[in-house]
C-alpha cells in the first residue's frame, strides 16, 4: 500500500498531539496498519526531524504502545526504534544540557562584566514546553538591553586575551554573530531588521520600549538569565514566525513555541494591546490562522479573550493551505551556491510566496521588494 504525503502528514500530526500530552481529535483513532513498512516509518521519522519534532513524535509513539493503541507487532522494527531513541538522546536531550551550560557560561561572562543578558526565542521558548529537553536546541539569541556595542568590545578583548580564534561577525542585519562553545550566538542590537520593510523601524521602537523590562529572569547554573516579558515575547514570536513564513517557510516546532507560550503566559499578555498592534502592522491574519491551527489541529485550549471567530469556507481553506505548507512547503527547491543563480532563486521564491506575503503584511509587495533589494545592498553577504 502506497500512502500519500497527506496521509503520512496526518499520522504525524496525530503523533504530535499525543506526544505533547493531548488526545486525538474527538471521534478519530490512530490507524497504522500491519502494512506500514520500514520505509514508511523512515519517511515519518524524516518528516519529524525536518519539523524539529523527533522527540515529540517518539513520545507520541510511546503513548500509543503504553495504552495498547498501537500493538507491538505494528510498531516499527526494534532496531529502527532504538536508533530513533539514540538520536533523540544525542541530538535533543544531551544537546539541550550542553545548551543550558553554554547559556549559563555566556551569562556568567556578561554578568561579571556588568551586562545583563536576555535570551530570546530558543531557551525562553523551551522553558514553556512540558519537556524542555525535547525542543531542539539551536542558536542562542540574546538582547543586552542596548549594550551590544560595549559588550561585543569586551567579548572581543576577552577572546584575544584567551588566545581564541573566535571572532565577532558584523556582516548581518540587526545582530552580530559569534560562537560560544559549539553554539552560534546572535547578539541583537535590533529585534528586527529595520531595513527590510518600511514599517519595521516603527515596530522596532515598540520592541525597544518593551525590551527595557528587566523584571523577568531565571537562574541557570547559578547565573542570572533574563527573559522577555509576556508582551515582548508574544509580539516577537509572531513577528519572527511571520518573517520566516512569508519569506520561505516555518516548521511545526515554531507553531508549538507559540502554543506553549500562550498556554503558560496567556494570562500575562495584554491581549487587546497585542491584537491592536498586530492589526496595525498587518500581522493579524497570520495570527488568526496560527491560533486556529493550535486549537483545531493540535488540541490546545483557546484563550477566552481570543475565541475563534465564525470562519468562512475561505478561511478554512487558507488554514489548511498554511498547515500543509508548514509540513511540506509549496516552494521547496534547494538554494543554489553561486551568486547569480541564487539571486534568481530568491526572486522566484518571492513570487511563489506572494500568497503568504499578502496574508502576513499590509505593505505593497513591490515596496517590500525594493526595500529588500536595498537591504541586501547594505549587507551583500545576505544575498
Task: Enumerate the language-model features and the residues they cover.
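Conserved NTP-donor binding/palm subdomain of two-metal-ion nucleotidyltransferases/polymerases, i.e.
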Residues: 2-138, 144-383
Amino acid at each position: 500500500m502506497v500512502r500519500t504525503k497527506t496521509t503520512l502528514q496526518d499520522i504525524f500530526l496525530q503523533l504530535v498531539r499525543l506526544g505533547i500530552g493531548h488526545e486525538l481529535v474527538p471521534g478519530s483513532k490512530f490507524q497504522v496498519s500491519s502494512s506500514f513498512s520500514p520505509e514508511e516509518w523512515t519517511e515519518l521519522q524524516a518528516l519529524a526531524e525536518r519539523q524539529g519534532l523527533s522527540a515529540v513524535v517518539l513520545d507520541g509513539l510511546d503513548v500509543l504502545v503504553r495504552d495498547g493503541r498501537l500493538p507491538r507487532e505494528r510498531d516499527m522494527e526494534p532496531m529502527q526504534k532504538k536508533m530513533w531513541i539514540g538520536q533523540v538522546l544525542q541530538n535533543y536531550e544531551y544537546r539541550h544540557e550542553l545548551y543550558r551550560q553554554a547559556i549559563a557560561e555566556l551569562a556568567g561572562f556578561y554578568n561579571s562584566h556588568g551586562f545583563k543578558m536576555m535570551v530570546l526565542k530558543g531557551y525562553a521558548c523551551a522553558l514553556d514546553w512540558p519537556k524542555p529537553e525535547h525542543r531542539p536546541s539551536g542558536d542562542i539569541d540574546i538582547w543586552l538591553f542596548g549594550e551590544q556595542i560595549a559588550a561585543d568590545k569586551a567579548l572581543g578583548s576577552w577572546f584575544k586575551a584567551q588566545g581564541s580564534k573566535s571572532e565577532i561577525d558584523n556582516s548581518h542585519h540587526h545582530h552580530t554573530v559569534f560562537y560560544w562553545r559549539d553554539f552560534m550566538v546572535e547578539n541583537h542590537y535590533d529585534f528586527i531588521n529595520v531595513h527590510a520593510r518600511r514599517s519595521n523601524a516603527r515596530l522596532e521602537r515598540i520592541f525597544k520600549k518593551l525590551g527595557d523590562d528587566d523584571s523577568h529572569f531565571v537562574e541557570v547554573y547559578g547565573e542570572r538569565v533574563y527573559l522577555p516579558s509576556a508582551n515582548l515575547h508574544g509580539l516577537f514570536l509572531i513577528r519572527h514566525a511571520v518573517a520566516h513564513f512569508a519569506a520561505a517557510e516555518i516548521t511545526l516546532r515554531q507553531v508549538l513555541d507559540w502554543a506553549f507560550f500562550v498556554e503558560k503566559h496567556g494570562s500575562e499578555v495584554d491581549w487587546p494591546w497585542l491584537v491592536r498592534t498586530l492589526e496595525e502592522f498587518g500581522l493579524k491574519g497570520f495570527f488568526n490562522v496560527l491560533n486556529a491551527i493550535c486549537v483545531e489541529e493540535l488540541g490546545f485550549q483557546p484563550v477566552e479573550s481570543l475565541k475563534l471567530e465564525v470562519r468562512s469556507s475561505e478561511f478554512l481553506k487558507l488554514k489548511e493551505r498554511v498547515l500543509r505548507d508548514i509540513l511540506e512547503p509549496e516552494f521547496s527547491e534547494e538554494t543554489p551556491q553561486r551568486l547569480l543563480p541564487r539571486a534568481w532563486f530568491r526572486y522566484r521564491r518571492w513570487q511563489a510566496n506572494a500568497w503568504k506575503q499578502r496574508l502576513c503584511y499590509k505593505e505593497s509587495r513591490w515596496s517590500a521588494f525594493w526595500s529588500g533589494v536595498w537591504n541586501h545592498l547594505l549587507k551583500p553577504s545576505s544575498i
